[in-house]
From Swiss-Prot:
Reaction it catalyzes: L-seryl-[protein] + ATP = O-phospho-L-seryl-[protein] + ADP + H(+); L-threonyl-[protein] + ATP = O-phospho-L-threonyl-[protein] + ADP + H(+)
Molecular-function GO terms, alphabetical: ATP binding; metal ion binding; protein serine kinase activity; protein serine/threonine kinase activity
E.C. numbers: 2.7.11.1
Metal-binding found in the keyword field: yes
Phenotype upon changing residue 453 to A: Excessive dendritic branching
Protein name: Serine/threonine-protein kinase tricornered
Gene: trc
Amino acid sequence: MMSSRTQDADGASIRFSDHTLDKATKAKVTLENYYSNLVTQYGERKQRLAKLEAQLKDESLSEAQRQEKRLQHAQKETEYLRLKRLRLGVEDFEALKVIGRGAFGEVRLVQKKDTGHVYAMKVLRKADMLEKEQVAHVRAERDVLVEADHQWVVKMYYSFQDPVNLYLIMEFLPGGDMMTLLMKKDTLSEEGTQFYISETALAIDSIHKLGFIHRDIKPDNLLLDARGHLKLSDFGLCTGLKKSHRTDFYRDLSQAKPSDFIGTCASLSCSPMDSKRRAESWKRNRRALAYSTVGTPDYIAPEVFLQTGYGPACDWWSLGVIMYEMLMGYPPFCSDNPQDTYRKVMNWRETLIFPPEIPISEEAKETIINFCCEADRRLGSQRGLEDLKSVPFFRGVDWEHIRERPAAIPVEVRSIDDTSNFDEFPDVSLEIPSAPIPQGGEIAKDWVFINYTYKRFEVRNLE
């Protein structure tokens, strides 16, 4: 057994086992989280009360009516505290269908047994998170979903855990994801592209204002609600869970010389059949890439691979890649394997080409070029969304009310649990995946998941 040494007041050496050190760390983290939560909860209550008082000032109510609303608010706060004390578990939900699958977990459509409300449940295996050193990414996912409480981010209602798994209970968006929509369509019109790129830009800008960088903007993570409007998902989780999102996966490729690749580039002559075959090949392999542990680096900005630091501008690069895919039918750097895609991304000055047989406007082309360029001059890198508002391609966009308008492509939803816009997983059991409960020392690091549990205040209205 490993141990660590320290000294007592007299200078004598004291040896502590790793088991003792882990227990001490767990106690320290538990206490820190307890008092941190008290401060956070107090601040949240003050914010909710301040919001109520601001609303009361704007309403023409008598003092008696205002007092009644204050009493109702106090009752809601009391009920929320009671709800937070209730222990939530996987047994409180009935699994209806598997609607998503990744390298280390799955997403299920579930129904809460006591209320009948339908949610999307993401299940992540703790052992995988520890083994792959993904705890920080899992924590980022949970923390961003807690903080980003607005219309452009998928809403999380609960998070909890058991000895084996972590669970995120989120709103179910029946429209599916942008990847599925793009696979159904050959290409989108420029009007449709303008709509979805505008909504994605608003979503990206909203999380940047909160101080977060998504780092994994791609069609898979753009979800559509029942009206066809867009929301962002998978914050910090997919970035890193897949090998392709870890720089060391490509480190052995970084020695490749540009000249090694330019010859390959030259061989990709853009004849009509080439573009058509590339689109067909991309769609044929896209689904498998989404579910694999390898994934694809198609949407990742070059500076993310360089290990020289990156900022919010990397998300705007990804938006340019998605815009290209919407108009062309495939992303600009797609290849037969991730290694070649990586080389194309790193040599974007030579590889970002627009095949003449797929005509797009000069305004669209210029916008893509200004997204997929050097980070310091990239569209969105200076003033965020404000950079886009003066771009000709976005002329006519009602940035303030776009979500209130009809979506570019209507979504057909027949019921609250309609999953027709999702893949079928007939070979996957509905039973929540489990693993042997860790034994002995294996459970020692479970303290890293302390404070994972969460219940949203608004969920009180659903109970």
